[in-house]
């Protein structure tokens, strides 16, 4: 679960809060590119969860809890997953999402999803070109003709892992 809490970015699991950034995100008109990697087999505890914003790794957290090595988290497990809200229906995302990539079985860096513009130095997204893995998905929200799993929630990774939009 990734959401905003008092203008900070929070990464949480059923085990509790894992990361809460000290950086705040108060510019509601700004565009942000977030990459969260989970790699619980990693021998370095602080590298098991990484948070990147606009291509730069965030290293300052008010809460930093590491999963144990090889710990199975609720992400990518047989539990209900939500995008844009907490499982209880709270913490609704008050913004726009242009796309969501979920890569199963790899802990990738932001360079897989974006790059700095050579002329402006501004971080910009790029289309992911690799494998999504068995449970991976790519939501680009391009078909907004209806709010169904075959339209707005359609998975464009080729895996058919469609989502059912819900208000």
Feature names for model-found ranges:
Residues 18-26, 86-89, 124-129:
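Short surface loop/edge beta-strand patches of beta-sandwich-type extracellular domains
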Residues 72-97:
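Extracellular glycan-interaction patches encoded by glycine-rich segments
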Residues 1-5, 10-13, 37, 51-52, ...:
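Beta-strand-rich, repetitive solenoid scaffolds
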Residues 43-45, 50, 58-65, 96-167:
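Extended recognition patches within non-cytosolic domains
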Residues 3-4, 27, 74-77, 130-133:
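Extracellular/periplasmic catalytic domains that process cell-envelope and extracellular macromolecules
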Residues 2-70:
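Extracellular glycan-interaction surfaces
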Residues 1-2, 9, 16-21, 60, ...:
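Generic preference for hydrophobic/aromatic residues in regular secondary structure cores
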Residues 15-20, 89-92, 146-148:
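Short, surface-exposed beta-strand/loop "edge" segments at domain boundaries and coil↔beta transitions
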